[in-house]
Amino acid sequence: MDYFTLFGLPARYQIDTQALSFRFQDLQRQYHPDKFANGTQAQQLAAVQQSATINQAWQTLRHPLTRAEYLLSLHGFDLASEQHTVRDTAFLMEQLTLREELDDIEQSKDDARLESFIKRVQKMFDARLQQMVEQLDNAAWDAAADTVRKLRFLDKLRSSAEQLEEKLLDF
């Protein structure tokens, strides 16, 4: 059973996150291992396994990138274990330039410049995310997979910038 079915949701990117949360809580109550403490060893093991599956499904579907990756996996794109890389040279050059800019910001310890950088990267991420949503809605799986690969780069860059922000605030 796929994760969408487990939570009673349609297998598409745009989901009702409130319904996801309610169903998660319901499933957790239903299959919590403590409810099977007096059961057989087989029942206890099954409850632990089911609870682990529910938690994994919840973690996967609640985050936009992992939800997209999972949806793509249902359509034959295993992005989690693939060795495929982004082939868009212009995008890769832009990422290199942004990484260099972040390094410069780290050296200069310029808070205002870092704040501007984070906002810019977030805007880039949001634009790509919207592009990916449209691609998934239109079942453009190849294009969506490529966009997810690019979103991973932007997500890592955003995370690095936010870590730098925390580091600069600690001084």
UniProtKB/Swiss-Prot annotation:
| SMART domains (UniProt xref) | DnaJ
- A GO CC term assigned to this protein in UniProt: iron-sulfur cluster transfer complex
Q: What one GO molecular function would you report for this record?
A: protein-folding chaperone binding
GO BP annotation list: [2Fe-2S] cluster assembly; protein complex oligomerization; protein folding
- Record's protein name: Co-chaperone protein HscB
Start and end residues of each J domain: 2-74
**In its keyword annotation, does this UniProt entry include Chaperone?**
yes
Q: What InterPro entries does the record point to?
A: DnaJ_domain (IPR001623), HscB (IPR004640), HscB_C_sf (IPR036386), HscB_oligo_C (IPR009073), J_dom_sf (IPR036869)
Task: Kindly state the subunit structure of this protein.
Answer: Interacts with HscA and stimulates its ATPase activity. Interacts with IscU.
What job does the chain carry out? Co-chaperone involved in the maturation of iron-sulfur cluster-containing proteins. Seems to help targeting proteins to be folded toward HscA.
> What protein family does this chain belong to?
Belongs to the HscB family.
Q: Which gene codes for it? A: hscB
The organism sits in which domain of life? Bacteria
Q: Which UniProt keywords apply?
A: Chaperone
- What HAMAP family has UniProt attached to this entry? HscB
